[in-house]
């Protein structure tokens, strides 16, 4: 959040008095700057709304509403929709794991494997990505690895039908907001293979810095490629 927007946000918050944890608000921060929901971000001439609906409960992150998306907890009942993209080789291999083989396998992952990983790695629950106005999960975004107490790695998947629309970037901005505010992280990282150009573009759009390029690593299929790691510090995010 830029200093200009943050100052305006604080002014409105002070004037409004005590705030409920869940709500919808609208106010003028500065000329041409309109704040909606709990958070306002202005970027590249566009208004970007991020509305965080509540707070963290145990390990569950609050639902989030953005301009076009609704991010919510993934449920076992979402298995069929998630399988629709998690079963595609062009989606999963670049992300570092093999395609799901059945809806039943996906159900087991959602019900047993995923919650166990959250506990063992001390990472918060992630999100299913839904288009606003629908409840269909078309993608996933979460913190999939913990590298330090205050450093988490972000990962994401999206059904190919929705590629090229900026959906992952929009969802990732919301996850950054949660990570740096509610989770009080110092740094968020993104790791991808050198041939995954789409993931590299997302990291660059979000303001991440390429910090390392490890040569000739094996990918999930055993093929040699570069492994790239990007990082974004909280101080850099606050200064945007």
Segments and roles (model prediction):
Residues 19-20:
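N-terminal, intrinsically disordered charge-dense segments
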């Amino acid at each position: 959040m830029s200093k200009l927007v943050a100052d305006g946000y604080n002014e409105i918050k002070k004037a409004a008095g005590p705030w409920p944890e869940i709500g919808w608000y609208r106010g003028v921060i500065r000329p041409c700057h309109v704040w909606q929901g709990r958070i306002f971000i202005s970027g590249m001439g566009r208004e970007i709304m991020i509305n965080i609906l509540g707070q963290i409960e145990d390990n569950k992150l609050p639902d989030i509403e953005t301009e076009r998306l609704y991010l919510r907890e993934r449920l076992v009942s979402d298995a069929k929709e998630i399988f629709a993209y998690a079963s595609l080789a062009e989606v999963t291999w670049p992300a570092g794991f093999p395609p799901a083989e059945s809806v039943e396998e996906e159900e087991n992952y959602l019900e047993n494997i995923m919650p166990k990983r959250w506990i063992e790695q001390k990472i918060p629950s992630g999100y299913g990505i839904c288009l606003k106005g629908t409840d269909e999960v078309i993608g996933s975004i979460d913190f999939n690895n913990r590298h330090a107490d205050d450093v988490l790695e972000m990962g994401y998947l999206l059904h190919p039908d929705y590629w090229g629309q900026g959906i992952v970037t929009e969802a990732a901005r919301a996850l950054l907001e949660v990570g740096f505010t509610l989770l009080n992280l110092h740094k968020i990282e993104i790791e991808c293979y050198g041939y995954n150009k789409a993931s590299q573009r997302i990291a660059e759009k979000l303001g991440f810095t390429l910090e390392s390029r490890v040569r000739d690593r094996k990918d999930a299929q055993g093929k040699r490629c570069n492994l790239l790691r990007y990082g974004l510090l909280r101080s850099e995010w606050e200064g945007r």
